[in-house]
Amino acid sequence: MEVKVLNINGKETGRKVQLSDSVFAIEPNKHAVYLDVKQYLANQRQGTHKAKERAEVAGSTRKIKKQKGTGTARAGSAKNPLFKGGGRVFGPRPRSYSFKLNKTVKRLARRSAFSIKAQEANIIVVEDFVFEAPNTKNFINVLKALGLEDKKSLFVLGDSNKNVYLSSRNLKATNVLTNSELSTYAILNANNLVLLEGSLEGIEENLSK
């Protein structure tokens, strides 16, 4: 598929780029997308939750009342989970939620995510640009020129560009990543995908394998 190349002023440069059909025009595999997003979100979890169980609650193990003759149910330690302040039955323990996913599935998921954005016509290709210094106002001007000021957008760079990244960091709806940092979640979480020309070769090289 062919896409027009714009400059940072939102004007057409008169050039077009050919996007690989094997990356941007496949039939999306929804299950692969589901698995990759699930893995990404699972990996974000700290898993540090912890509740004290019966043996871990502070306090005496003394039997709180005699076994018979009270007319009420038998009771042992005040740590019994039935009592207020007692331990929790099968409480949460610290654990890792991460799980492995084959590289083939991850690549398929990302190709599917790119294809979904292409089908929705939400991909913009912009010629490479740099800022001499971090400047949020300059980045906002780029968003305005591209019609993305109030939209959640993801800019994909070919190489790490510190000034461009720092210029966007204070913008809540804008995310800037290099092609090596891309995830299926990041692609789908953005309404619009802005691909800098320099990122295309790396994207297609990584995902065409």
From Swiss-Prot:
Domain of life from the UniProt record: Bacteria
Keywords: Ribonucleoprotein, Ribosomal protein, RNA-binding, rRNA-binding
Record GO terms (molecular function): rRNA binding; structural constituent of ribosome
Biological process per Gene Ontology, one example term: translation
Keyword match Isomerase: no
A Pfam family assignment: Ribosomal_L4
InterPro entries (UniProt xref): Ribosomal_uL4, Ribosomal_uL4-like, Ribosomal_uL4_dom_sf
Chain spans, region Disordered: 45-78
One CC-aspect GO term: ribonucleoprotein complex
Function: One of the primary rRNA binding proteins, this protein initially binds near the 5'-end of the 23S rRNA. It is important during the early stages of 50S assembly. It makes multiple contacts with different domains of the 23S rRNA in the assembled 50S subunit and ribosome. Forms part of the polypeptide exit tunnel.
Stated family: Belongs to the universal ribosomal protein uL4 family.
HAMAP family: Ribosomal_uL4_B
Quaternary context: Part of the 50S ribosomal subunit.
Name listed for the protein in its UniProt record: Large ribosomal subunit protein uL4
